Amino acid sequence: MEGLTEGRLVHFVMPSHEHRPAIVVRVWDQLSGMVNLVVFTDGSNDVKKSEESYSRDPSPVLTLWETSRSYSEDPQPFTWHWIERA
């Protein structure tokens, strides 16, 4: 896959179908686009916590580690794609 390298910024599709920025930290398969990502979340808006756990740790989860994620031109949950042009 042309242009795929560690450090590239891409979009990851959350289970809610919303897109979040992610950095490619490892390319497993250049041809298929299988990668490891660090995904930047929208804090507690993306990662819900129960009231009990929130009272113990009010810090929202700001990144997610997503391993062995596939490329998809059709944005599907748990896949990544190139960032759309504005």
Where do the language-model regions lie?
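Short, well-ordered loop/turn sites that connect or cap secondary structure elements
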Residues: 3-4
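Basic/aromatic-rich interaction segments and small domains that mediate binding to polyanionic partners
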Residues: 9, 14-53
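Intrinsically disordered, low-complexity, charged/polar segments
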Residues: 34-86
